[in-house]
Structure formats: C-alpha cells, structure tokens
Amino acid sequence: MSDDLREVAPDVAKDIYLQQRWDDLSEATLKTHGYRIEAFVSWLEEQAISSMAEVDGLTVHNYRVHRREEDGLKKVSLQGQISTVRQFLRVLASVNAVDPEVAEKILLPTVRKGEDVNEKRLETGRAQKALEYLDQYHYASRRHVELLILWRTSMRRGGLRALDLDDFDREEPALELRHRPPET
C-alpha cells in the first residue's frame, strides 16, 4: 500500500464513484453500476478490507474467482461485473484512494462470439395460450400489451421498456424505436 493514498472506506468509495459517473451514464446504467459496485463493496467488507488503499490485484482476482465459483456467474455477466469494478478502481485512483496500477492490471474474461446470447425461447404454443388468456381475462392490461408487442415484433425487452406513446403511429399503425440519450 502506497503512503500517499487516502484512506477511503469501501462504502464511501461507492458514493464517490456514483457521484463521479452521474453525468456520464444513463440512469439505468448508473443503477446497474451501483448494484455491481455494492456487490464488490459487500465482499470487501466480508474480507475485512476497511480501506480501498488495501485493494490490490490479488484482491480483485479473488473477487473474480468468488463471483464465478460461489455466485455462479456466467462468463458474460462476470465480464460486465469485473469491467465495472475496473472503472470503479480507475475513478478511485483519480482521487488517490487506490493505486492506479491496480485497475490497469485487471484482466477481463474473454467472451467468445455467441457466448453472450441468451438461447431461451418462448415456445409458440405457450405464447398463444398466454395471449389467449390475457385476451380473455386481462385485455389491454400492461402485461397483455407487452407480451403482444414482444411476440409480434420479436423486439428485445430493453426496446419495449424504452417505448413511449409518441413512438406509436396511429396512421400506419406502427411502432418506431428511438434512441433517447438523457437530457443534460
């Protein structure tokens, strides 16, 4: 541990990171990073690490092994988790709370093409039964409309969540997906 590093508790470090990234990330991404950093901070506390200055390459390696083996994360999830931890440590290095070399030494899991694809599919028969049920008992409910849109368009769930009333064209009728970066 370097003598010129500040003593910053892991939970305080999380707050510093989220404040620093507030302007750079969308609300949803910031929330995701918060969950990922919270998992890392909790693990650090379980390891009796009370200052971020104590975190080194071996600490991050042990966390990665813990997430993979004990928490059962798949490679693509682990890559996202460790990538966020690396960003976290870079921000902390910028405020002298972590040795700057730690973040740069982190090796991310390699995800081969196709490993990041979720192969789960909703079978046609199941989808039709669900839609029939919703048509009869929950017509025009949020669940009904969401399943109907997903089934008819093959849209990703993230796209569905991003839809706004202005995306519906009554003339066509059609839905138009638009990227809406956060307003500053």
Language-model-detected regions and their locations in the chain:
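Short, surface-exposed helix/turn micro-motifs that flank interaction/cofactor sites
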Residues: 86, 161-162
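Short alpha-helical hairpin
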Residues: 4-17
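Hydrophobic core segments within long, regular secondary-structure runs in both alpha-
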Residues: 10, 57-64, 124-131
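N-terminal core-binding DNA-recognition domain of tyrosine recombinases/integrases
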Residues: 15-117
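Basic, Lys/Arg- and aromatic-enriched nucleic-acid-binding interface segment
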Residues: 124-157, 161
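DNA breakage-rejoining catalytic core of tyrosine-based enzymes
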Residues: 112-129, 184
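Conserved tyrosine-mediated DNA breakage-rejoining catalytic core shared by Y-recombinases
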Residues: 162-184
